[in-house]
Amino acid sequence: MIDLLYNHSLDVYSANGEDGINEYILKHLELDSGVVLEIGAWDGFFDSNCANLWSNGSYNGILIEATSKLNIADLESRYDNINCYRELISSSNTLEDVIEKCKFDVDENNFVLASIDVDGDDLNVARSLGKYKPIILIVEPNGDVITRSNSNGSTIKELIDFGVDFGYDFMGMSGHVGRHSGNVYLIRNDYKDKFDICSKPWQQRGIILSEGLLY
C-alpha cells in the first residue's frame, strides 16, 4: 500500500496539513536542520508552511512577503535564526537574488524546503529560484484545475511538468479530503528513491481538488 502524503496531515500553523506532512518527509529523510524558505509569508505564522520548522530553532528561515503584514523588526528581534524581507519577486528581483542576500549560507545540502504561495504567479516565482534547489518544494496550484489553463494560477500538471524540467518529481498534495485542496509537493530527484510514492503514475499519488475529488 502506497503511503499518500495527506495521510500525515497535521496543522500547527499550516492550513492544509503541511506541518504534519513536512515532519513526515523530513523524518523519513533523516533531516533535522537546515534552511527553509517561505514566500507569501504573511505575518510569519498565519497559514505558514515553514513556521513550525524555524520557530523551534532547529532550522534557519528565510521569510519573504510583499506587503506590510510581515513585521520584520519584531520577528528578527525575537528569532535570531531568520531573515525577513519585504520584497516583490519579479524578473528583476528574483528569489535567487534574495537568497544571495541572507546572512547564512544556502546550498544544495542544507536547503531543505521552500514554500511558494503568491496567488497566481507561483510558477514564475518557482523558476526564479535559479541555482538554488531545495530538497522539497511546495507550490500552490489552482486547486480547481488539473490540466486546463483556463483561470488564474498554475494547474497541477503544469507544476508537475515544471518539476520534471527543474530536476524534481511529484510526491502528491496536501489537503483535507472532502474539504479543500492544498499544495503540490515536489522532491528533488536525488532524494526521490527514498519514497515508494514516486514509483507510481502521477495520477495515483494523491491529487486533491477543491471540490473534494481525489485522484
Give the predicted meaning of each segment:
Residues Y6-C102, N109-I116, G143:
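SAM cofactor-binding core of SAM-dependent methyltransferases
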Residues V35-E38, N52, N56-N60, V106, ...:
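Conserved acidic-Pro-Pro-aromatic motif
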Residues M1-S9, I208-L214:
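Membrane-proximal basic amphipathic "stem/tether" segments
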